[in-house]
A protein has these predicted regions:
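Gly/Pro-rich, tryptophan- and cysteine-flecked surface segments typical
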Residues: 1-335
């Protein structure tokens, strides 16, 4: 299911976020990571205001508190809480960040992020978050991810073949759009570097820059990487080529989950897609992607499908090809 939000000047959607736990085993498998939600941009400035929504599960809750820790661009934090005398079954919780009186000054007119602990019960807390322009003409929505920064969940990169990526992310440059990668301090602590590569139409790989971002294990601020600007300064952009981030652990401990924000943007809010790097777990990595989704077509809207495929074996692409099949559905039939 896609939840689609439309304004006068924009449209944003997010796929299904929260769900009811199926049984006790489902609760047991997810309870350790379910409480703290994070991994998204927040804004509270002269142009944009963010919001957070969540839904309670099937049980009534009494005398509980919601806790949230906000981080600004400097990595500084402040904590807030809200007390609820009662939360009904399936009740929606809606938070406008402008209701936190200290927050606007604290964020210093720049982007930040937060970690929120919800008092909900028996529901998987992948919550809906987003940002409105102050005139409500533009909107961007995404969903949260769980906070893994207090867990020690690693892959030993000594066991990974040197001809394979430890961790990587193929992506496309779309004409007319900027692209940011936003890295949040929400994964198991590690010292890592991010490099940038390019695959051309002949499937040849070249390194654009070995290190576009260094991340130290104790960082607390956002790391915002403007990929299009970096490619422009180092190389001529070719929209038909596939670009790839090469993530390397400096201490042989690679977080088993590496989540980030994917911001395609023009002059307005970014897409802030919650996405994960492809981590080499030592087994076959299947093709990934969204296999369904709405297509918009009007005088003001168009849909772009961007596909990229890179093997964990760095030179395998030379001898590898993929067949892509697509069906486009209208209201009553396949177009």
């Amino acid at each position: 299911i896609d939840a689609i939000y439309e304004t006068k000047e924009g449209i944003s959607l997010v796929h299904s976020n929260q769900r009811i736990f199926e049984n006790f085993q489902d609760i047991k498998n997810n309870e350790s990571i379910n409480k703290t939600q994070t991994g998204f941009d927040i804004h509270l400035d002269s142009k944009n205001e963010s919001f957070i929504t969540a839904i309670n599960g099937p049980e009534e809750i009494k005398n509980k508190e919601l806790y949230v820790e906000f981080f600004n661009y400097l990595g500084k934090s402040i904590k807030e809480k809200i007390r609820y005398d009662k939360i009904n079954p399936y009740q929606a919780i809606f938070l406008e960040l402008k209701s936190f009186k200290r927050l606007r000054k604290f964020l210093k007119n720049k982007r930040g992020f937060c970690k929120i602990n919800l008092p909900t019960k028996n529901i998987f807390n992948r919550i809906l978050v987003g940002t409105f322009s102050k005139d409500k003409k533009k909107i961007s929505t995404t969903h949260s991810y769980y906070d893994c920064s207090k867990f020690s969940d690693y892959i030993n990169t000594k066991n990974i073949d040197k001809n394979q990526y430890q961790c990587y992310l193929p992506f496309n440059i779309i004409e007319g759009l900027d692209l940011e990668i936003v890295i949040y301090p929400i994964f198991s602590r590690s010292n890592i570097t991010v490099g940038l590569e390019e695959y051309n139409l002949d499937r040849r790989r070249k390194t654009i820059k070995n290190n576009i971002q260094t991340i130290k294990k104790n960082f607390n601020d956002l790391k915002i990487i403007n990929l299009k600007n970096i490619i422009k300064t180092q190389n001529k952009i070719n929209k038909n080529n596939v670009y790839c981030l090469n993530i390397v652990s400096k201490n042989n401990l690679l977080p088993s989950r590496l989540t980030f924000g994917f911001n395609y943007k023009k002059t307005s809010l970014g897409s802030n897609i919650s996405e994960s790097m492809i981590v080499n777990h030592g087994k076959d990595i299947k093709g990934r992607g969204f296999y369904w989704g709405p297509a918009f077509c009007s005088k003001k809207l168009k849909t772009i499908i961007a596909l990229s495929s890179v093997s964990k074996n760095k030179d395998e692409l030379k001898n590898n090809s993929k067949l892509v099949k697509m069906k486009l559905y209208g209201k009553d039939k396949v177009i």
